[in-house]
Amino acid sequence: MVSVNLEAKKIVDRMIEKADDLKIKVDKLENGSTVIDCGVNVDGSIKAGELYTGVCLGGLADVGISIPGDLSERFALPSVKIKTDFPAISTLGAQKAGWSVSVGDFFALGSGPARALSLKPAETYEEIGYQDEADVAILTLEADKLPGEDVTDMIAEECDVAAENVYVLVAPTSSLVGSIQISGRVVENGTYKMLEALHFDVNKVKYAAGIAPIAPVDPDSLKAMGKTNDAVLFGGRTYYYIESEEGDDIKSLAENLPSSASEGYGKPFYDVFREADYDFYKIDKGMFAPAEVVINDLRTGDVFRAGFVNEELLMKSFGL
């Protein structure tokens, strides 16, 4: 079976080789692990964001950036485009922010292929029937500071690899790379909701594609989190090709999949988060979804479309 860590390593090698051009910094720690700063103490770049997103997806997706993105005739922004022939593995088996990395006073949400070695969370890998067996572990962290050896040692132990084979990429939410990689979760937001909220077998999703605008960079981490989530919730468009079975209600799946189907829909995410006392667990899971969904049922040939791009809320969120 394909290895998300080995595929992602090909991208990481390119990033290390072109670090100066990408405006990123590569540090080798004393335990041999490698930390790649993509926005903490460096500027990062558009290309670095594109490659970082590819790493998050385990190297199993094509990532591109349109400038300007064709969000609508009257409102255009640079946008991230995702295409994958391995939707379940690339989005849920790699990209999903499913590992809460906490060591001492360091905390970050971990995404990327190393999760398929540590099996975090195990339920996700049981659902998609996947586990990696690579001898290299690659993790991306959404954090405002860089991890030390204690963090990479923990990652090595959890993934059962040597510390020298651990590669950690870091980008704050409030950085350009952070903004790009969160918009790059547009397809994953849909597969996540299919599995976690609608309890649909995501292995039936054979191909997927999506596009979402890149949120303006905001130095305030909380406001940046709001804007980046809104880029997908109000501006993300996705396409899923599903091999259904008799009894699957794909029309209902499509109708319930967009963010607008959520009870909490209607406000910028920052406002929703603030009203929830900054507690993610108080927010309806169904809100984390793309704005618009198109599903092609490969068994029947039917096509279903639901949701819409909400330009008004997007512009309100972005301050336009």
Curated annotation (Swiss-Prot):
Keyword Cytoplasm: yes
An MF annotation (GO) of this entry: methenyltetrahydromethanopterin cyclohydrolase activity
Keyword match Cytoplasm: yes
Highest taxon above the source species: Archaea
Pfam short name (any one): MCH
Annotated function: Catalyzes the reversible interconversion of 5-formyl-H(4)MPT to methenyl-H(4)MPT(+).
Protein's name according to its UniProt entry: Methenyltetrahydromethanopterin cyclohydrolase
Naturally occurring in which organism (per UniProt): Methanothermobacter thermautotrophicus (strain ATCC 29096 / DSM 1053 / JCM 10044 / NBRC 100330 / Delta H)
Lineage: Archaea, Methanobacteriati, Methanobacteriota, Methanomada group, Methanobacteria
